[in-house]
Swiss-Prot record:
It holds the Pfam family FtsJ. It is found in: Cytoplasm. Disulfide bonds: none annotated. This is Ribosomal RNA large subunit methyltransferase E. Specifically methylates the uridine in position 2552 of 23S rRNA at the 2'-O position of the ribose in the fully assembled 50S ribosomal subunit. It comes from the Bacteria. GO terms for molecular function: rRNA (uridine-2'-O-)-methyltransferase activity. Residues 11-20 have a biased composition (Basic residues). Residues 1-20 are annotated as: Disordered.
């Protein structure tokens, strides 16, 4: 069971630390204080994960069992790589038998058992390169992609929703029957067309907000389980 970390008793670092750097802007100092005092950040360091985001995936899996039996996984917006770490472990991926492909336009340090593509997912060549990298039909596509924020809520929401839509269409194109799709989204409404498309192609579609997401964050996750196969998509087009 993925439990919430207990403050300060496992990492050797107490919570409630203050940053005493008068040269830093107040906003930067507040961000750094929140980061170093975040129990999930401390737990990620203790357990060897590259980011606290690992616990979001583990928490979602604890309830929805999307990692169970996964043989090949594609990780979109993967940097710095904590989801890919989990994916490599559950699939048994090794450098000699790659079963996890990860993509991000940001540079990522290499991970055992993960084929990393430093490439914008919106690049037209990305889908083919990902399929080649993962070495077969994936049964899970996970996306933690979010557009760089502008400070304008509506603009940020629309840009991230576009990434969700592109990722969803990619998942429908590549998943094996029975596969799952998980993507980050923002509170503020999921586009009606996207939900309709997912419900047409998957047996269950739900919104999830794991406890490890910061309370003040507008992020949520959209989970589509049980891909019906490309036959379902074809039947919808004919109707």
């Amino acid at each position: 069971m993925t439990k919430a970390p207990i403050a300060g008793n496992r990492t050797g670092r107490k919570l409630g630390q203050r940053v005493k750097n008068k040269k830093m802007k107040a906003s930067s100092r507040q961000w750094l204080e929140r980061h170093i005092n975040d129990p999930y950040v401390q737990r990620a360091q203790l357990e060897g994960y590259r980011a606290r985001a690992a616990f979001k995936l583990l928490e979602i899996d604890e309830k929805h069992h999307i990692l169970r039996g996964a043989r090949r996984i594609i990780d979109l917006g993967a940097a710095p790589g904590s989801w890919s770490q989990i994916a490599a472990k559950v699939t048994g991926s090794t450098d000699d038998d790659i079963r996890v492909a990860a993509i991000d336009f940001l540079e990522m340090t290499q991970l055992p058992g993960v084929k990393i593509l430093q490439l914008d997912f919106l690049d037209p060549s990305a889908p083919e390169k990902l399929l080649e990298a993962v070495g077969g039909t994936p049964d899970l596509v996970i996306s933690d992609m979010a557009a760089p924020t502008t400070g304008h809520h509506r603009t940020d929401h629309l840009r991230t929703m576009h990434l969700c839509e592109v990722a969803a269409h990619f998942a429908v194109e590549v998943l094996g029957e029975g596969g799952h799709f998980l993507t980050k989204t923002f509170q503020g409404g999921t586009e009606r067309e996207l939900l309709a498309m997912l419900k047409q192609n998957f047996r269950q579609v739900v919104h999830v907000k794991p406890n490890s997401s910061r309370a003040e964050s507008v992020e949520m996750f959209l989970l589509a389980k049980g891909f019906k196969g490309r036959k379902a998509e074809g039947e919808a087009e004919e109707a």
